Amino acid sequence: MDLQPSIDVTSPDQYSAGTPTPAAIVAGEVPASEAPRPLSAFDMFSIGIGPSSSHTVGPMRAGLAFSTELCALPDYSHLSHVTIDLFGSLGATGRGHNTDRAVLLGLAGYDPETVSIETVESLIPQIASSGRLPFAGGREIPFDIESDIRFLPRTVLSYHVNALTITAYAGESLVLERTYYSVGGGFVMAQTNNDPEHPEIASLASAQETTGMCTPAPYPFSTAAQLLAQCTRSGLSIAEVVRANELSARSEVALDAYLDQIAHTMFHAIEAGISSTGILPGGLDVPRRANALAAQLRARAEKAFSASERRGWAGVMQDPLRAMDWVNLYALAVNEENAAGHRIVTAPTNGAAGVIPAVLGYLVAFCPEAGASFPDFSPSNLAGISELPLDESSESASCRRASIHEFLLAATAIGALIKTNASIAGAEVGCQGEVGSASAMAAAGLAQALGGTPQQVENAAEIAMEHSLGLTCDPVGGLVQIPCIERNAIAAVKAINAARMALWGDGRHTVS
């Protein structure tokens, strides 16, 4: 039986022989023209379900890749059972992050971008009651949740701390075995040999991503210095450099439609979080707060204050920090949706999914540069922030769409730099790699949308990242709730402050 990989793998591991390493690129030993193609907005932003990109979205994609490959094998018709081994961090916090459920959803043929929340919540009870796994391809096989999924936190594979192995059998015969590594942000690597000490690694990629990786970028960069040099030589902004790279691999219509989809999904997550009440799952009894906070802020926005009240900060128009309350609301709403296992945008991870939507919400609600008619625009937005049009229907809508696209493209550049040269995986580098990265991306995006120069945009990201260093990944009970939800709100406010600090300077700074 041929057990060699038949999965769609591209983009050899960046650390393999002959490929420039991040250290060599940072040291200036490799020119930009020889650096790997920068990661895309399609890489840095993806739609999925909570609560974790590395522990939920990635394992679900791994399960789907395994089932897709397995269904194409001739022995699939004789499939009798499947086992799942979760190693390292996946084994340690997998229960709190629903890693087991995520892998089973993937094996059942579901994708994190499109699976319904009803299916997500019903699959485990269905398997537990029937003792059968509805496998992709229409088959059902016996499955015991207690014995066929093993949590092995003390076993850490050599390539990455987030690893899982899925094995399929026909009776006593091995049909297929694959080991996957969920390396953060929903990115998944597949092991293509059977040597655990010297694994050969390749990334799982869609056909669209494969096409993009094979197309040279007109403005390649792997460091901030290279990015700024490309901007200086071309006269383009950071967002324009990223857009040009994107358009070398896909059409403008496809790019803009994807950016619209990402923005709408972020705004819908805000609205969903605001409209939901109750206790978050997992056993910590953490109550949702966004709904009550939204009601309080709306009441304050509509209240008629007395003359004495208006002399204080109680008057909504007199409160100099009123926007901060709405930013906090947006971040809390998204991260409560993530903690509930609902649909959000991985940006760049699920644990940090509330930062960029919160700052994006600030941009469209409070900034005239994005079409907001401040101070007349009411941030209470009773119609819902997700209903704000992103089209050519009006000057403000067109301005809003352009600002959002600039924001997301500049954020992509910063996220790509961090992912290439460091890590966005909390299990690998702590929360500085998740919330810190998201704060830096959001700061850069906001500075770009507010008209910052490339140097100011880079400086905004640097300020936000510098003051996120040292954050640990310390979720209580292995759940993405405490301190994660509040930490997103703090990071969003930090991003706005970083952008404003950078915009008052000329972009020159000491730390890089």
Model-derived features: where do they sit?
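Beta-strand segments within the central parallel beta-sheet cores of soluble alpha/beta enzyme folds
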Residues: 75-88, 371-382, 389-391, 395-413, ...
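Alpha-helical support elements that line or immediately flank enzyme active sites
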Residues: 54-71, 357-369, 443-451
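N-terminal signal-anchor module of multipass membrane proteins
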Residues: 34-49, 65, 81
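Hydrophobic alpha-helical bundle architecture
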Residues: 399, 410, 416-488, 501-510
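Intrinsically disordered, low-complexity terminal tails and inter-domain linkers enriched
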Residues: 5-31, 370-399
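C-terminal regulatory domains involved in ligand/effector binding and gene-expression control
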Residues: 111-313
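Conserved phosphate/anionic-ligand binding catalytic regions in large, soluble enzymes, centered on
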Residues: 45-65, 339-359, 429-440
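Accessory "access/gating" subregions that flank catalytic or transport cores
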Residues: 252-374, 396-430
